[in-house]
């Protein structure tokens, strides 16, 4: 998606360790106009797919998933919680997820009320690196007896193993901007 690639080139900041900082438009301050175009593009890429729920993980995927929802008949958006809260149902699906960016492992949870047998789920997230977050969410989808329709990613680090890991479990992966490499303080797209 050229619009997203241009935004990355213009506003993205490269940090040590192949970390691309896009907090000015994607995962801290949100460019809603860009998110709207992202939603349209995911609708185009998953056209004809029967989707009745969108699943993401807190926190950065929530904004994108919410906008994407309007292009799939405003289907519910469910997000896996990383932190145990007093008001969280005790009856949950759980999976361990390792964050590449934070180098931390989380036990993510979704209430069993919100993932049901027969649900057709589109997984949405801001980044794909090693695939750990997406694999954890796919595990939760399976625990609930639901069906994964596909995985929509805003930015994929194509030089990491995430896509391969997701394709191993049969996931259809659609990424809007695929980084081929980060070299000499420059981003190169596939």
UniProtKB/Swiss-Prot annotation:
Report residues binding 5-phospho-alpha-D-ribose 1-diphosphate.
129-133
Q: What does this protein do?
A: Converts the preformed base xanthine, a product of nucleic acid breakdown, to xanthosine 5'-monophosphate (XMP), so it can be reused for RNA or DNA synthesis.
Specify which residues bind xanthine according to the UniProt entry for this protein: 20, 27, 157
What is this organism's lineage?
A: Bacteria, Bacillati, Bacillota, Clostridia, Eubacteriales
Protein name, as recorded: Xanthine phosphoribosyltransferase 2
Cross-referenced Gene3D superfamilies, in alphabetical order? 3.40.50.2020
Q: What is the protein's species of origin?
A: Clostridium botulinum (strain Hall / ATCC 3502 / NCTC 13319 / Type A)
At the top level, the lineage of the source is Bacteria
Keywords attached to this entry: Cytoplasm, Glycosyltransferase, Purine salvage, Transferase
Reaction(s) catalysed by this chain's protein:
XMP + diphosphate = xanthine + 5-phospho-alpha-D-ribose 1-diphosphate
Note whether Calcium occurs among the keywords.
Answer: no
- What family, per the record? Belongs to the purine/pyrimidine phosphoribosyltransferase family. Xpt subfamily.
Q: Which GO terms describe its cellular component?
A: cytoplasm
Name where it's found: Cytoplasm
CDD domains named among the record's database cross-references? PRTases_typeI (cd06223)
